[in-house]
């Protein structure tokens, strides 16, 4: 099911920056935000509690990757924060993914990271020694996530159609690396515009710097939201 709001990546490290950014939006504007490693490691669980207290949805993107027992226990702790979505690395294997699902329970959305959108095929082959194509690797990880009863996968928009063809109905695709037309792609290798992601079937999109570093973040958010809605 398509999420109507683009998820805003809160690429900050301090509470003050985060609060100042969120304060730009009207109180009635309920956002869906992503808390990544930088902000969570700097501010801890309290930043999640604060954002939830404002009525926003939280995607906690920590990409857990450890032995199954450790991941199960960590997810059980994160569940207590009332998060709406979490991530694990698909490379941890099906047993680890199943453990993550057990720890988090059935309420929050749980998605698997396949290949990072900063990873090129040459990098994958050289650094990870995976000698298939990048798409084949993404599909392999996505099928493992579905087998473990996860809700979806993180992938580039170019991979969405292929993933949906090999996974059960309802398996969702979250697409980072979204950039409005004409913007700087930064360190992302595989990017699309909100309109392209919508047309190709992405269920969630994540947008960071084009909103958080815009001269008018609220206007930038509303423009991207409108493009995503079609």
Curated annotation (Swiss-Prot):
Catalyzes the decarboxylation of orotidine 5'-monophosphate (OMP) to uridine 5'-monophosphate (UMP). It comes from the Bacteria. It catalyses: orotidine 5'-phosphate + H(+) = UMP + CO2. The keyword Amino-acid biosynthesis does not apply. One of its GO terms (molecular function) is orotidine-5'-phosphate decarboxylase activity. The gene is pyrF. CDD domains: OMP_decarboxylase_like (cd04725). GO terms for cellular component: cytosol. SMART domains: OMPdecase. One of its GO terms (biological process) is 'de novo' pyrimidine nucleobase biosynthetic process. Keywords: Decarboxylase, Lyase, Pyrimidine biosynthesis. Its EC number is 4.1.1.23. Homodimer. Substrate binds at residues 11, 34, 61-70, 117, 179, 188, 208-209. Pathway: Pyrimidine metabolism; UMP biosynthesis via de novo pathway; UMP from orotate: step 2/2. SUPFAM superfamilies: Ribulose-phoshate binding barrel. This is Orotidine 5'-phosphate decarboxylase. The active site is at residue 63. Belongs to the OMP decarboxylase family. Type 1 subfamily. It holds the Pfam family OMPdecase.
């Amino acid at each position: 099911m398509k999420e109507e709001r683009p998820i805003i990546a809160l690429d900050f490290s301090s509470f003050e920056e985060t609060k100042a950014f969120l304060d730009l939006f009207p109180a009635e504007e309920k956002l869906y935000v992503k808390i990544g490693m930088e902000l969570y490691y700097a501010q801890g669980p309290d930043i999640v509690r604060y954002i939830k207290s404002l009525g926003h949805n939280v995607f906690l993107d920590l990409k857990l990757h450890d032995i199954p027992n450790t991941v199960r226990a960590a997810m059980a702790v994160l569940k207590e924060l009332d998060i709406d979505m979490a991530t694990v690395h698909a490379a941890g294997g099906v047993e680890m993914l199943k453990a993550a699902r057990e720890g988090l329970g059935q309420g929050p959305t749980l998605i698997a990271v396949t290949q990072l959108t900063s990873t090129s095929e040459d990098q994958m082959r050289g650094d990870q020694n995976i000698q298939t194509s990048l798409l084949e690797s993404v599909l392999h990880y996505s099928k493992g996530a579905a087998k473990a009863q996860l809700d979806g996968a993180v992938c580039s928009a170019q991979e969405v159609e292929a993933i949906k063809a090999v996974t059960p109905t309802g398996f969702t695709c979250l697409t980072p690396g979204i950039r409005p037309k004409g913007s700087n792609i930064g360190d992302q290798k595989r990017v699309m515009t909100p309109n392209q992601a919508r047309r190709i079937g992405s269920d969630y999109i994540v947008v960071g710097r084009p909103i958080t570093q815009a001269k008018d973040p609220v206007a930038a958010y509303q423009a991207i939201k409108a493009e995503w809605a079609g």
